[in-house]
């Protein structure tokens, strides 16, 4: 195995962290301004750190408890007859993921609270310098998140390869290594959920409280130093849009790579990396994305005061994306082998893999462009809300809701096209690698996102410090661009979450051994509906939490205005710390229930109703959550920029309107309603769908078979099989009762059967069903020969031989691939498959006359012990008075156990007639 490429991955992460440290040191060296500016920045920094400490105190208890459960689950190595690839080390992986996610948030928070006041001071000199400081602060956040993710994943993967002595890609040891690695993603996503929800509640409780009393009731400007909630509001920008967004994208980044690795482990290729290229490819591409994100930052600069800041950010973003795509082309061609690659029956080439990466990049770009259109100032959607503000508060709300709902159309169509395009390029691996391609430049995306709240804080400090108007004009310029980048960042995050969740879903289906998600089944359909409901109740709880916390904030601000004389005259200083404490306590208290729903629901559904119903739940959550996330984020962003448009003046029906006008007051109401939409519940949707998917992936090995109807439907064995052939008579089982009544009338005790019976291939049949994405591939194979010999003295003997050259799935091209290709059945070399058994016993769990034959199945020269379940249907003379015995049954085999790179579990059903020789 060429191990050099494996060690390159964490090294790329370390490179990102080194550049992050250099840029962080540069930010710290910049001038922090006058004493009063430093004092205000100190309040913000102290409030932000107080929140993090309070949050970590609570989450540390959760992490210890969850790690203990995971450690216990890792000691379970067998359920029934099924071996598990588990290890207690998953608990360590979980803790590291949680710590790295928290550390990513801390790094971002720390540098943001340093960069804000330094951006304010830089704005006293020029727009160019202010952009440089604020964007460098954002870059520290971006590189910290991406560097920690790549370093953590790459480093742990190397450790686990050594720990579990992995020598083959398709080995049980590799399965264990990757399943343990899922703990890292679970830890990251768990912390991300609480950081995003808690941070969102914090920031919007402070924002809404500050706006309602400060701007609406007291009539003072935004970020006015006299407003007791203004420090909490500025702290909230860091808590929600820096730490929350950082943890969010850290989780997406890790989950995307991990989902691709899980699917890559199912692929068997002959390459120069020991068959590991499909597993390593997403890590290498994302690692190179860090390098090109660093290069992209060099292009983010402006020449003078009239330069367009948005264009500068876009140039850096497009450069990093373009360079990453170009590099991906060469990396894919270098790492992946020539010829066809197969995953679950879908064949593709390395050209298709690159095509999928390109599709993912294009989808991410389109999502950002569309989000910018619906939320940016000067665009038609925002202008429509401005116009509707002229007729009152209600029409402003109606306009914003309409814009948010319409904004789902193009993104959903884009996502649908991206899913289909990437799937056609490279199957489910293509969908996963498309998400990885989209996330590759996360460092740059997050740098642009984090720049926004830094600029917002800088403007707040300028306002509170009463700096000259030109300073506030420069910070407002940056802030306006920051609002748009924050909105586009949320669109990007939702798009990545959608593709990531689909990739995680595909990985879950493979590990859980599900053939298909059949929504015709009542439990699955029920799960689908419940899943669709969860984002609504989750959003309701988040918005309700903001409302409750905002009420407490409003009461506190009113109390201070009432009880502290001289605040409005600048003679007394407000008690900022009390408002900070209200937001902190409320966010910690209120985040627990939504977080609990996301974590516990998949566990309850999976362990009670099984993986198929859980699959239905995940499908409902994903579709509903993506729609809710896009709608709420875009509606909130549009309301926000509609309000901000009044600062420079807007033209409504030929008349100019400014701040404090009636239309402006209506826009403030809309912005207040939109705040929890765009900064709390909306952004939380993408973590919700990812976290529920990753929890399902982690528990998948433990819920295999739960909810299965194998034991209750004896003749059909699986409820998907609705027809039985018993002694030449075909029956249709429309219900369990009907099925049982038929079988009870025909089942016999095999003890009555003695002697030799030769299998009659002409009157016997064998069908198979192999999972193929969501829909099964069904086919048949001819039973070539065989016999059943029963003798009390010598013991039973069963032998069956299959003619593998007769594989038939009603598709000539697919049949040719299945028969001829080495990664499938390779019938030119292995023409026959056999089953031999010398032990038959009753299986009381399946019924009084149900039996299990324990024997050896040989396919492609590979021998595995299997259990064949069957019912003896009795004997009956044919027209020539030859005694005929009948058998029906099934067995299940894992395709990979026999070197077949198609699907997961193959279900085999058979009906056999065997004739007793006449002499």
Task: Show which residues each predicted segment covers.
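Hydrophobic packing and interface segments
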Residues: 1-716
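A general marker of short, structured functional hotspots
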Residues: 3, 47, 249, 501, ...
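Low-complexity, intrinsically disordered regions enriched in charged/polar residues
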Residues: 21, 679, 733-737, 812
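Intrinsically disordered, low-complexity regions
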Residues: 75, 81, 155, 237, ...
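Short, solvent-exposed coil/turn linker segments
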Residues: 308, 349, 732-733, 803, ...
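Intrinsic disorder/low-complexity detector
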Residues: 451, 485, 688, 712, ...
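Intrinsically disordered, low-complexity terminal tails/loops enriched in metal-binding residues
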Residues: 712-752
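Low-complexity, acidic/polar, glycine-enriched regions of mature
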Residues: 741-919
């Amino acid at each position: 195995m060429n191990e050099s490429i494996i060690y390159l991955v964490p090294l790329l992460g370390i490179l990102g962290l080194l550049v992050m440290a250099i840029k962080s040191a540069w930010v710290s060296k910049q001038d922090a301004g006058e004493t009063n500016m430093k004092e205000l920045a100190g309040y913000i920094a102290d409030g932000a750190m107080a929140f993090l400490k309070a949050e970590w105190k609570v989450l540390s208890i959760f992490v210890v408890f969850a790690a203990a459960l995971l450690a216990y689950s890792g000691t379970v190595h067998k359920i029934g007859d099924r071996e598990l690839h588990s290890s207690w080390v998953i608990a360590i992986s979980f803790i590291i993921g949680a710590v790295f996610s928290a550390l990513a948030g801390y790094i971002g928070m720390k540098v943001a609270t340093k960069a804000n006041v330094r951006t304010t001071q830089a704005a006293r000199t020029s727009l160019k310098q202010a952009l440089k400081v604020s964007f460098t602060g954002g870059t520290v956040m971006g590189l910290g998140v991406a560097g920690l993710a790549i370093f953590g994943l790459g480093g742990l993967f190397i450790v686990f390869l050594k720990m579990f002595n992995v020598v083959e890609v398709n080995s049980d040891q590799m399965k264990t290594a990757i399943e343990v690695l899922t703990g890292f993603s679970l830890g990251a996503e768990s912390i991300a959920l609480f950081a995003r929800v808690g941070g969102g509640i914090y920031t919007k409780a402070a924002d809404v409280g500050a706006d309602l009393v400060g701007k609406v009731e007291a009539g003072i400007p935004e970020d006015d130093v006299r407003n007791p909630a203004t420090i909490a509001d500025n702290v909230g920008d860091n808590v929600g849009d820096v730490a929350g967004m950082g943890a969010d994208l850290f989780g997406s980044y890790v989950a995307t790579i991990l989902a691709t690795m899980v699917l890559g482990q199912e692929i068997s290729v002959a390459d120069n990396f020991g068959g590991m290229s499909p597993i390593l490819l997403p890590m290498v591409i994302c690692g190179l994305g860090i390098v090109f994100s660093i290069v992209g930052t060099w292009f983010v600069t402006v020449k003078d005061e009239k330069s367009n800041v948005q264009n500068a950010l876009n140039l850096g973003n497009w450069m990093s994306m373009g360079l990453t795509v170009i590099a991906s082309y060469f990396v894919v061609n270098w790492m992946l082998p020539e010829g066809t690659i197969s995953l679950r029956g879908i064949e593709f080439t390395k050209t298709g893999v690159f095509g999928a990466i390109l599709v993912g990049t294009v989808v991410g770009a389109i999502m950002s462009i569309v989000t910018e259109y619906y939320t940016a100032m000067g665009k038609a959607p925002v202008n429509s809300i401005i116009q509707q503000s002229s007729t009152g508060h209600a029409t402003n709300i109606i306009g914003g809701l309409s814009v948010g709902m319409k904004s789902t159309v193009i993104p959903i169509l884009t996502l649908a096209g991206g899913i289909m395009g990437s799937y056609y390029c490279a199957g489910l691996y293509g969908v996963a690698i498309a998400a990885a391609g989209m996330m590759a430049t996360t460092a740059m995306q997050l740098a642009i996102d984090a720049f926004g709240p830094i600029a917002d804080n800088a403007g707040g400090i300028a306002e509170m410090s009463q700096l000259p108007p030109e300073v506030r004009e420069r910070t407002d310029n940056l802030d306006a661009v920051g609002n748009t980048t924050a909105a586009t960042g949320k669109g990007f995050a939702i798009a990545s979450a959608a593709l990531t969740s689909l990739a995680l879903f595909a990985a879950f289906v493979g590990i859980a051994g599900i053939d298909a998600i059949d929504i015709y089944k009542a439990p699955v359909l029920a799960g689908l509906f419940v899943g669709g409901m969860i984002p609504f109740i989750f959003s309701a709880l988040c918005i309700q939490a903001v409302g409750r916390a905002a009420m407490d904030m409003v009461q506190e601000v009113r109390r201070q205005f009432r009880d502290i004389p001289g605040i409005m005259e600048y003679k007394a200083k407000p008690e900022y710390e009390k408002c900070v404490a209200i937001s902190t306590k409320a966010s910690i208290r209120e985040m627990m229930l939504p977080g609990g729903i996301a974590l516990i629901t998949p566990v309850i559904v999976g362990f009670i109703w099984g993986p198929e119903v859980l699959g239905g739940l995940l499908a409902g959550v994903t579709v509903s959550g993506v729609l809710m996330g896009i709608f709420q984020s875009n509606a909130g962003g549009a309301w926000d920029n509609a309000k901000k448009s009044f600062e420079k003046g807007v033209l409504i029906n030929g008349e100019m309107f400014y701040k404090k006008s009636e239309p402006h007051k209506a826009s403030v109401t809309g912005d207040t309603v939109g705040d929890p939409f765009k900064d709390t519940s909306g952004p939380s949707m993408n973590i919700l769908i990812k976290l529920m998917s990753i929890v399902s992936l982690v528990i998948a090995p433990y819920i295999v078979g739960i909810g299965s109807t194998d034991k209750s439907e004896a003749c059909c064995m699986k409820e998907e099989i609705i027809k039985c052939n018993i002694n030449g008579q075909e029956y249709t089982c429309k219900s369990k009762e009907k099925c049982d009544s038929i079988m009870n009338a025909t089942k016999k005790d095999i003890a009555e059967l003695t002697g030799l019976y030769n299998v009659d291939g002409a009157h016997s049949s064998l069908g198979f069903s192999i999972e193929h994405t969501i829909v099964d591939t069904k086919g048949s194979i001819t039973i070539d020969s065989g016999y059943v010999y029963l003798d009390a003295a010598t013991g039973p003997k069963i032998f069956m031989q299959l003619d593998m050259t007769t594989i038939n799935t009603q598709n000539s091209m697919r049949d040719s691939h299945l028969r001829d290709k080495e990664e499938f059945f390779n019938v030119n070399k292995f023409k026959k498959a056999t089953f031999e058994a010398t032990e038959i016993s009753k299986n009381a769990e399946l019924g009084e006359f149900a039996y299990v034959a324990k024997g050896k199945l040989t396919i492609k020269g590979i021998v595995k012990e299997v259990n064949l379940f069957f019912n003896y249907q009795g004997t009956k003379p044919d027209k020539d008075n030859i005694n005929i015995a009948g058998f029906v049954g099934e067995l299940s085999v894992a395709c990979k156990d026999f070197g077949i790179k198609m699907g997961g579990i193959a279900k085999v059903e058979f009906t056999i007639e065997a004739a007793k020789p006449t002499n």
